[in-house]
Amino acid sequence: MENKVINFKKIIDSRGSLVAIEENKNIPFSIKRVYYIFDTKGEEPRGFHAHKKLEQVLVCLNGSCRVILDDGNIIQEITLDSPAVGLYVGPAVWHEMHDFSSDCVMMVLASDYYDETDYIRQYDNFKKYIAKINLEKEG
C-alpha cells in the first residue's frame, strides 16, 4: 500500500466531534502499538528513519506538524493539522517530522511492537536498502 492520507469519518453534533479508529477498517492493519508525541520543541525535528516491515498511521490530535516522506523515488511533504486525518506510512519509507506547533499532539498507530532491528536509522543505509529491494523485484 502506498503512503496516503486517510480522511476519517467525523461525527459532529451539538456535543462536539467524534472520530472512530478501527483496525482493518479505516486503519489498513491490525494495531499492535499506540504511542503519542507531545511537548515537542518546534525547531527540533523528529523521525529521520525508516522501517523494514512496520506500517504506521500518524494522526495529529492537536496542533500541527509537517511530515516528509521519501520512498527512494518520490519525496512527499504533507502537513497534518486535523484529528480527522491520518497519514499512512508504509514499510521502507524514510520519514521526518518538522515544524511542530507548540500544542501538537501526534498519535502513532503501529502494526507491530517496538523492534529496534526493524529500524533503518542512517539515510545512506536506507538508500542501499531501497536499491536492494528494487533489484529483488527486477530479478
Curated annotation (Swiss-Prot):
Homodimer. The gene is fdtA. Keywords: Isomerase. It holds the Pfam family FdtA. The keyword Isomerase applies. This is TDP-4-oxo-6-deoxy-alpha-D-glucose-3,4-oxoisomerase. It is an enzyme of class 5 (isomerase). Its EC number is 5.3.2.3. GO terms for molecular function: isomerase activity. Changing residue 49 to N: Loss of catalytic activity. It comes from the Bacteria. The active site is at 49 (proton acceptor). Mediates the isomerization of dTDP-6-deoxy-D-xylohex-4-ulose into dTDP-6-deoxy-D-xylohex-3-ulose in the biosynthesis of dTDP-3-acetamido-3,6-dideoxy-alpha-D-galactose, a glycan chain of the S-layer. It catalyses: dTDP-4-dehydro-6-deoxy-alpha-D-glucose = dTDP-3-dehydro-6-deoxy-alpha-D-galactose. The lineage of its organism: Bacteria, Bacillati, Bacillota, Bacilli, Bacillales.
